[in-house]
């Protein structure tokens, strides 16, 4: 059968540069859709020969949206290879900074990147289907969203002197103690931001209730789930063991990040620079899994803060206690995690050790290699470093959140295209739904390929004879 080809390049309101190609049959139905990551990966090679103590300042330059995640993962890998476990007060301060990262990133994505599609509508005029349109539609909600992100950034800057590329965590701990004035400033703002997170949760729950048909047909498919948990299988974002659960929610493995290569392999497709991680024992594609908010909430049994845990139980009831497979519920899970991060930040600020000056372990016992792991807002982030006797890096491997989710995004793009895109004249709103299949995962493509890219969007539609029949531009 003759086919048409539609190209969406780049996908907008995500971080980084990707495109989607939709191959259509002559009858206007979709044959297949592909998610291409076309930034070239190279950052790991740049790091070879550098001192491991430099990595917590080098790797955040991969990304301006989640620099704290790379900053902390690099420091944690440095702890391991230098044999210098961080003292408890330093771990508390690192985790507090990480909660700020989660708050600002989740808040920004829900309200400003993913939210416009939901609050304004997938078919809304693309010229204002963004934060500008949100300001016009609901200025009060938009102001709350901005203040929520500002609070997350304030946590980071209170600790690291600046919110972008902070200078704080180092192998063995952190480089300066916290102070009571900073603690008090942050504590005074938490109650307001908890209320904003509750508003966000109610917004997405109401939207899902009013759009249940879309929720139930928009990229719903089974996978495994992957992420950090506590020893009791509670949600963990800073440090813990990696838990991998199956499509039915049962536990498949629990292992230390130091041993991830024993359990995870990577599949390659010719149409993407980004590899596809999977669970070795099940093979490809049966071993594909999801990470990030939806993956983490399916992967944990409970949350150790009261408000977020109460919401988690409602979330888990959506599919009768089985894993929640609906891609659009990523937004709901994201706001539950935002609420947890706010509650957890309050717990950390109340800990007496948060003001301790015991913040750095200067002992050294070099190891040949080590892994740092953290739950970045978008999912599990692994930094694996190999060093020589001088502490110089001989090899670097970064497995980032968006890489873990590559299968899920590719599958979602294919399913959404087949469900919503109909020819012969393809509407902009149809293609925006395909973009949202990626956007819901909140991908950071500069992280996944360790590069940066941006360009205008143009969609070209070719008929079954290969002639250009339609052009859509943003």
Segment roles from a protein language model:
Residues 378, 383-385, 395:
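A translation/RNA-centric and nucleic-acid-associated enzymatic feature enriched
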Residues 391:
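Active-site catalytic microenvironments in core metabolic enzymes, especially phosphate/sugar-handling
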Residues 394-396, 400:
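Active-site/pore-lining binding-face segments in mid-to-C-terminal subdomains
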Residues 1-378, 400-474:
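Active-site bordering "gate/hinge" segments
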């Amino acid at each position: 059968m003759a086919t048409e080809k539609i190209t969406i390049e780049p996908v907008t309101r995500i971080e980084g540069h990707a495109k989607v190609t939709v191959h259509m049959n002559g009858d206007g139905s979709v044959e297949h859709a592909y998610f291409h990551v076309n930034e070239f990966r190279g950052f790991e090679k740049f790091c070879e020969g550098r001192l491991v103590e430099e990595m917590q300042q080098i790797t955040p330059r991969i990304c301006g949206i989640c620099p704290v995640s790379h900053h902390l993962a690099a420091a944690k890998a440095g702890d391991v290879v230098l044999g210098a476990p961080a003292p408890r007060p330093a771990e508390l301060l690192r985790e507090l900074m990480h909660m700020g990262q989660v708050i600002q990133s989740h808040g920004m994505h829900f309200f400003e990147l993913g939210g416009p599609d939901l609050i304004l509508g997938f078919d809304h005029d693309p010229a204002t289907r963004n934060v500008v349109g949100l300001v016009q539609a609901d200025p009060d909600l938009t102001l709350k969203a901005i203040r929520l992100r500002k609070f997350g950034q304030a946590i980071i800057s209170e600790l690291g002197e600046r919110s972008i590329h902070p200078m704080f965590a180092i192998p063995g701990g952190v480089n300066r103690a916290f102070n009571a004035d900073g603690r008090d400033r942050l504590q005074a703002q938490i109650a307001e931001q908890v209320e904003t997170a509750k508003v966000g949760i109610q917004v997405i729950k109401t939207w899902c209730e009013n759009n249940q048909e879309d929720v139930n047909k928009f990229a719903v498919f089974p996978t495994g789930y992957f992420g950090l948990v506590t020893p009791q299988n509670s949600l963990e974002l800073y440090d813990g063991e990696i838990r991998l659960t199956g499509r039915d929610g049962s536990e498949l493995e629990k292992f230390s990040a130091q041993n991830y290569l024993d359990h995870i392999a990577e599949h390659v497709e010719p149409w993407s620079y980004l590899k596809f991680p999977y669970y070795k024992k099940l093979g490809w594609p049966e071993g594909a899994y999801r990470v990030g908010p939806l993956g983490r909430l399916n992967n944990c049994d409970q949350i150790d803060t009261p408000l977020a845990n109460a919401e988690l139980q409602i979330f888990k009831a959506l599919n009768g206690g089985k894993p929640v497979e609906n891609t659009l519920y990523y937004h709901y899970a994201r706001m539950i995690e935002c609420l947890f991060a706010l509650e957890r930040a309050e717990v950390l600020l109340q800990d007496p050790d948060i003001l301790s000056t015991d913040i750095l372990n200067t002992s050294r016992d070099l190891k040949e290699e080590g892994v740092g792991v953290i739950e970045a807002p978008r999912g599990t982030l692994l930094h694996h470093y190999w060093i020589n006797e001088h502490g110089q890096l001989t090899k670097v491997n970064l497995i980032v959140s968006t890489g873990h989710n590559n299968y899920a995004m590719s599958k979602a793009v294919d399913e959404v295209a087949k469900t919503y895109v109909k020819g012969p004249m393809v509407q902009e709103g149809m293609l925006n739904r395909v973009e949202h299949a990626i956007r819901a995962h909140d991908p950071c493509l500069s992280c996944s390929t360790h590069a940066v890219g941006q360009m205008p969007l143009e969609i070209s539609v070719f008929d079954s004879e290969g002639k250009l029949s339609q052009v859509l531009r943003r």
